[in-house]
Every structure is written in C-alpha cells, then in structure tokens.
Amino acid sequence: MGLTSQLIPMLVCLLACTSNFVHGHKCDVTLQEIIKTLNILTAKKNLCMELPVEDVFATTKNTTEKETFCRAGTVLRHIYRHHKCFNQPLSGLHRNLSSMANMTCSVNEAKKSTLKDFLERLKMIMKEKYSKC
C-alpha cells in the first residue's frame, strides 16, 4: 500500500511530461511538413503560381492565428479544387492547416495576390511559428 501511494504522484508526473512531449512533437512534425511542402512549391516555376488568390494575410486586425490558418486552408482548397494546380501538395497543406485551425471558415477578401506571394507569405508565417515551437 505504501508503495502505491509513492507511485501515484510519479505516474501522474510521467503522464503529464509525456503528454507535453507528444503535443510539442506533433507541432514540430506538422510545421516541418508544411514548411517542406511550401519550400518545394515556392521553388517551382509554373503558370499556376500567377493565379490570383484571396489575400487572407492582408487583414490581420482582430484575427486569431487559428482563423488565419483556417482562411489560408480555405484558399488552398479553392485552388486545388477549381484550378487543378498542384493538387496533391495543396491538399496536404490544406489538411495540415485545417488540423491546426480545427474550425471552419469562409473567405470573402476583396484584395488579391498571386499564389506565389500567398505561399511565400504562408511560409514566412510558418517558419516564424516553428521558431517559437
């Protein structure tokens, strides 16, 4: 009985520490995958990179990080569904951003940018987030 009472706090601590490690590691892996995909895409020279997309990064006032990720994912989904450009990597980016945002949203931006500029900006945001992870 005495051994059990000594083990309980140790097991609770072990579970808490393991949980923090696993969640931190998931953040790192997801961000690494996003950054790697963005590096590959932004290096490509393709007409698709000149497509106009909604500039969801222009309005950062009163926008949470999760909302930004959600809106960026929505833009990517629109591109790979309607323009058939970079379907596999863009759908992977959309999936990862959606898992980070964990919400649904719509995009109605008047301001536009090119897909290339959009991806470059997203890459910069993800690298900044990774440096804090």
Swiss-Prot record:
<dbReference type="GO" id="GO:0006955">
    <property type="term" value="P:immune response"/>
</dbReference>
<dbReference type="GO" id="GO:0005615">
    <property type="term" value="C:extracellular space"/>
</dbReference>
<keyword id="KW-0325">Glycoprotein</keyword>
<protein>
    <recommendedName>
        <fullName>Interleukin-4</fullName>
    </recommendedName>
</protein>
<feature type="disulfide bond">
    <location>
        <begin position="27"/>
        <end position="133"/>
    </location>
</feature>
<dbReference type="GO" id="GO:0005136">
    <property type="term" value="F:interleukin-4 receptor binding"/>
</dbReference>
<feature type="disulfide bond">
    <location>
        <begin position="70"/>
        <end position="105"/>
    </location>
</feature>
<keyword id="KW-0964">Secreted</keyword>
<feature type="glycosylation site" description="N-linked (GlcNAc...) asparagine">
    <location>
        <position position="96"/>
    </location>
</feature>
<dbReference type="InterPro" id="IPR001325">
    <property type="entry name" value="IL-4/IL-13"/>
</dbReference>
<dbReference type="Pfam" id="PF00727">
    <property type="entry name" value="IL4"/>
</dbReference>
<feature type="signal peptide">
    <location>
        <begin position="1"/>
        <end position="24"/>
    </location>
</feature>
<dbReference type="GO" id="GO:0045893">
    <property type="term" value="P:positive regulation of DNA-templated transcription"/>
</dbReference>
<dbReference type="GO" id="GO:0005125">
    <property type="term" value="F:cytokine activity"/>
</dbReference>
<dbReference type="GO" id="GO:0050776">
    <property type="term" value="P:regulation of immune response"/>
</dbReference>
<dbReference type="GO" id="GO:0016239">
    <property type="term" value="P:positive regulation of macroautophagy"/>
</dbReference>
<dbReference type="InterPro" id="IPR009079">
    <property type="entry name" value="4_helix_cytokine-like_core"/>
</dbReference>
<keyword id="KW-1015">Disulfide bond</keyword>
<comment type="similarity">
    <text>Belongs to the IL-4/IL-13 family.</text>
</comment>
<dbReference type="GO" id="GO:0008083">
    <property type="term" value="F:growth factor activity"/>
</dbReference>
<dbReference type="GO" id="GO:0050728">
    <property type="term" value="P:negative regulation of inflammatory response"/>
</dbReference>
<dbReference type="InterPro" id="IPR002354">
    <property type="entry name" value="IL-4"/>
</dbReference>
<feature type="glycosylation site" description="N-linked (GlcNAc...) asparagine">
    <location>
        <position position="102"/>
    </location>
</feature>
<dbReference type="GO" id="GO:0035771">
    <property type="term" value="P:interleukin-4-mediated signaling pathway"/>
</dbReference>
<dbReference type="InterPro" id="IPR018096">
    <property type="entry name" value="IL-4/IL-13_CS"/>
</dbReference>
<keyword id="KW-0075">B-cell activation</keyword>
<dbReference type="GO" id="GO:0042113">
    <property type="term" value="P:B cell activation"/>
</dbReference>
<feature type="disulfide bond">
    <location>
        <begin position="48"/>
        <end position="85"/>
    </location>
</feature>
<keyword id="KW-0732">Signal</keyword>
<feature type="glycosylation site" description="N-linked (GlcNAc...) asparagine">
    <location>
        <position position="62"/>
    </location>
</feature>
<keyword id="KW-0202">Cytokine</keyword>
<keyword id="KW-0339">Growth factor</keyword>
<comment type="function">
    <text>Participates in at least several B-cell activation processes as well as of other cell types. It is a costimulator of DNA-synthesis. It induces the expression of class II MHC molecules on resting B-cells. It enhances both secretion and cell surface expression of IgE and IgG1. It also regulates the expression of the low affinity Fc receptor for IgE (CD23) on both lymphocytes and monocytes. Positively regulates IL31RA expression in macrophages. Stimulates autophagy in dendritic cells by interfering with mTORC1 signaling and through the induction of RUFY4.</text>
</comment>
